[in-house]
Amino acid sequence: YLLQLSLKYLKSESIFTDSHREHRYQELIQLAQDYLEVLQLQGYMVWEDVYAEIEDFPYKLAKNLCFEKLCIPRQYHPEYVRLLLKNMLEPCYGAGREKVRVYSFCNYLEFAMYVMEEAKGPRIFKREELADRLGISSYKLDQILQDVAMDAELVNVDFSYYLDATTSWKKPFVRLDTDTYFCLDGRMEGYAFYEVMFQIIYAKRGSVFSKHQGKLLEQMVYRMFREKHFPYITGEYRQDGDLPERDCDMILEGNERVMFVELKKCPLPGSYEQANDVDVLSALGAGMLYAQEQILWHKLRLKEKGVLALYDKEGNHIQDYTPGKKPVIAMSICMPEYDFLTDRMMTETFLESILRVTYHAIDPSQEKKLDKLNKRTENIRMVTARLFDGMKYTTRDVFYNSLFRSLQQVWTMLRVCDTLDVFLDMCATQLVMITGAGDVYVDIWNALQLKG
């Protein structure tokens, strides 16, 4: 909250002495801590999450949305941003006369990486420094700066209350004058390089570009696993009676367990930072829940047919797959960060609620936004009933072995795992480990420590 306010009133020079400035900073921080205490958004006991009732999920969701906006800046590793730029956007940028800007994509990538690596905390960049270090021609550099910088007076112009909309996430640079640019932090602002270039290409290529993003995402994830030499299976199976045709994005089979993985690009809505829980639930239905529904169809096909007969896009038979008696983990992956929503307890509570409740908006004008979510819950209940075929089951029987992760979280795990079995073990550990941190990166760290 204080960082966003500071960006709104950013000045090139301070009017205070160092000692006076430090004193005022401490006062501000204390006021912010007191404000957080008064709002009563923060829990201090891990058991609050463990024993949370499903009926309380909407309240828990709203409270966490507010806490996230107030306290937690979203961060992306520079190398992950590079991965997104190279794999998701460069193929659509064009070359020669077909490129969407006068500068090359290589120019843009070099610029972005330099800024992210240099801005380890608040950093002023001079145009002269960028020209000297990067060796980009003056005309091309000016266009890059025009694209990635927002004038200081336009940053967070309508932001006062902590749930007000911000604009700082749209551009990585704040333009203080024609030669001076400010970056808050390379990890906090790095994803804006992706946002900027996405909008540039979209303005030129339109819906053809955006529709191609899902396929590029799949190819990027497959490449990530191939580079680690982790084997995977992918394909699609055909309609068989009343069992529908489905894509099977990824199957990971280790010595002791199997994981079904489904990928979605689905971003959080812009109203997320304003704690619009209706829009967030709608996005969860379109992304995470849709992926879990697909995985339930995989399980049903295996139960009723005993095998997944997989084909490629050209209709060629790849293989007949069965996991045998190995336990199956389900993981849905979305490309952007989903903050606290990927926390184990949040995922479990939401998925369990799907089998017991429907979601409705207090505001009648917002109700239609939840239609697709509730339709998807109907589908999941139908598939679940058929999967258990008259047997008694609990909500945990259906979704206990389910994870929801951002792609950056999966990328982080891949960086520290030497074999596929180690990766699957780490995922299995996170299914049973509760830290109360609400942060998957803490869970990854703790899983590493448990392995010694």
Over which residues does each language-model region extend?
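Acidic, metal-dependent phosphodiester-chemistry machinery of nucleic-acid enzymes
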Residues: 1-215, 219-232, 268, 304-452
